[in-house]
Regions:
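Iron-sulfur cluster-binding electron-transfer modules in prokaryotic oxidoreductases
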Residues: 1-164
Length: 164
């Protein structure tokens, strides 16, 4: 959609640029799975925009749920142009995961974390629904938790994480 808007010269491309604030959830040394200390047994996990590798799935006991909007555009690219539309798009995705039974969502990109966690209050306002008991983790935070490491970035989440 963003490319189509720019191609049609309906808006200046600079108007769509957004400087993403620093997100500590992606500051992590852990890039791959080590010793498993917490297997997430009985947890339903939603992933947004990527698939968890099969070798990780085989080592933990979590159930990875599928949901309709797992690969849909979350509106980040339109945030500067139309914030309300962006919040509605992101709210539809996170609520789809929530309504599909996920206990939390794992994201692999800082922009996705920003939309789902940092903007969570705006998403709740936009949708008229609460999901304060739902969490969003970066992939690196998730790998850390599997290994029993509580990353300090968990304390900076807008949706407070109290999994372990």
């Amino acid at each position: 959609l963003q490319k189509e808007i720019i191609d049609l010269k309906l808006i200046n491309e600079a108007a769509l640029e957004f400087d993403l604030p620093k997100i500590n959830a992606f500051d992590n040394e852990i890039k791959e799975l080590g010793e498993i200390k917490y297997d997430f047994n009985d947890f339903n996990i939603a992933c947004y925009g990527f698939k968890i590798k099969d070798d990780i799935k085989s080592k933990i006991k979590a159930h990875f749920i599928s949901y309709e909007n797992s690969d849909k555009n979350n509106g980040f690219s339109l945030l500067q142009l139309n914030p309300e539309l962006s919040y509605k798009m992101a709210a539809n995705i996170i609520l789809d995961a929530y309504d599909s039974g996920a206990d939390f969502m794992v994201v692999n990109q800082a922009k996705d974390f920003y939309m789902f966690d940092t903007c969570s209050k705006k998403l709740m306002q936009s949708s008229g629904r609460e999901f304060k008991d739902f969490y969003v983790l970066s992939y690196f935070e998730f790998l850390s938790l599997i290994q029993g490491i509580k990353n300090p970035s968990l304390q900076n989440h807008d949706l407070k994480v109290s999994l372990i």
